[in-house]
C-alpha cells in the first residue's frame, strides 16, 4: 500500500516537471487578427472635391500623413467632416461611396468608389450648412480628392448626393511605421493599416530596457512617447477601432533611423 502511494507521488512529480518544462518552452503569446472587419450600413451624405486633377494639394493634411501616394493610400482619398474625423481617430478608415439621385451630377454607369480618410474638411461657420458650410457639424460630409470625385460625378456639379458605408481597407504589404523627432520625443506614424484602417491604440516594446509602453495620440495618426527607444529592436502593437490587435514583432532593427519607414510582414484583414 505504501509502495502504491509512493509510486503515485513520483508519477505526479514527473508529470508536474514535464508540464513546467513545456510551459517554459512555449512561445510568447501573440495577439492575432481574429476575424475580419465587416462593411457597415449604407448612409446618406454629400460629396464635394478639392485639390488638383492629379491629386496635388491632397497628399498630406490633418491626419499627419506626409505623402499619401507613397504611404499606401494613393490619391483615392477624402477629407471628412468633424463627426467622421473624430479628432484624428477616423484617420485611415475606408469608405465605399456612390453618387445617387442626381441625373445631371452623377457620372452614368460609374461604379462605387473606395476612398481612405486622410484629412479633415474643416467647418466654415460663416456659411450656412446647406450653402457653403458643407463640413459644418453635425453634417457627415466627404470632400473627395478631385481624381476620386471625377470617377463618380461631373466636375461641373460641384456637390452631389452620395450613399456611403464603412468597408474593410485592403492594403498591399504590412503595417508601416515611421519614427520622427529625437531620442527624447518620438513621433510614430502608423500607415498602410488594413481591416478597419483606423488606429485606436498603439504600444511599443524594446528588446532590452523598454517594456510595453502605450503611446498617446499627438494628432491624426501621429503617436508620441518620451521613452528613449534608440538602440533597441522595436515591436509595435496596434489596436484598430474595432478593438482587434496585431503585433509587429521586431519590425524596427536595433540600428533603426529617424525618418525611415519600416514595414511589417503582416497586416489586418
UniProtKB/Swiss-Prot annotation:
Reported function: May cause loosening and extension of plant cell walls by disrupting non-covalent bonding between cellulose microfibrils and matrix glucans. No enzymatic activity has been found. May be required for rapid internodal elongation in deepwater rice during submergence.
Presence of the UniProt keyword RNA-binding in the record: no
Main location: secreted
GO CC, alphabetical: extracellular region; membrane
Its membrane topology: Peripheral membrane protein
Family: Belongs to the expansin family. Expansin A subfamily.
PROSITE patterns (alphabetical): EXPANSIN_CBD, EXPANSIN_EG45
Gene (name only): EXPA32
Alphabetical list of Pfam families matching this protein: DPBB_1 (PF03330), Expansin_C (PF01357)
Name assigned to this protein: Expansin-A32
Amino acid at each position: 500500500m505504501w509502495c502504491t502511494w509512493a509510486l503515485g507521488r513520483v508519477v505526479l512529480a514527473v508529470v508536474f516537471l514535464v508540464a513546467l518544462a513545456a510551459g517554459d518552452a512555449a512561445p510568447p503569446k501573440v495577439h492575432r487578427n481574429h476575424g475580419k472587419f465587416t462593411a457597415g450600413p449604407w448612409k446618406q451624405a454629400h460629396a464635394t472635391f478639392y485639390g488638383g486633377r492629379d491629386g496635388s494639394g491632397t497628399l498630406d493634411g490633418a491626419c499627419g500623413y506626409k505623402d499619401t501616394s507613397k504611404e499606401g493610400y494613393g490619391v483615392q482619398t477624402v477629407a471628412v467632416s468633424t463627426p467622421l474625423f473624430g479628432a484624428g481617430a477616423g484617420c485611415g478608415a475606408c469608405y465605399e461611396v456612390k453618387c445617387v439621385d442626381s441625373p445631371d451630377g452623377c457620372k452614368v454607369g460609374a461604379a462605387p468608389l473606395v476612398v481612405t480618410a486622410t484629412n479633415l474638411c474643416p467647418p466654415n461657420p460663416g456659411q450656412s450648412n446647406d450653402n457653403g458650410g458643407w463640413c459644418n457639424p453635425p453634417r457627415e460630409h466627404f470632400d473627395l480628392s478631385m481624381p476620386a470625385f471625377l470617377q463618380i460625378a461631373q466636375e461641373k456639379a460641384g456637390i452631389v448626393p452620395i450613399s456611403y458605408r464603412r468597408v474593410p481597407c485592403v492594403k498591399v504589404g504590412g503595417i508601416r511605421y515611421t519614427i520622427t523627432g529625437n531620442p527624447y520625443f518620438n513621433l510614430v506614424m502608423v500607415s498602410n493599416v488594413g481591416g478597419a484602417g483606423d488606429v485606436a491604440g498603439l504600444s511599443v516594446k524594446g528588446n532590452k530596457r523598454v517594456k510595453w509602453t502605450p503611446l498617446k495620440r499627438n494628432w491624426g495618426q501621429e503617436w508620441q512617447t518620451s521613452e528613449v527607444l534608440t538602440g533597441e529592436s522595436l515591436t509595435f502593437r496596434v489596436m484598430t477601432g474595432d478593438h482587434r490587435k496585431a503585433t509587429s514583432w521586431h519590425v524596427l532593427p536595433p540600428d533603426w533611423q529617424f525618418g525611415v519607414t519600416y514595414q511589417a510582414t503582416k497586416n489586418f484583414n
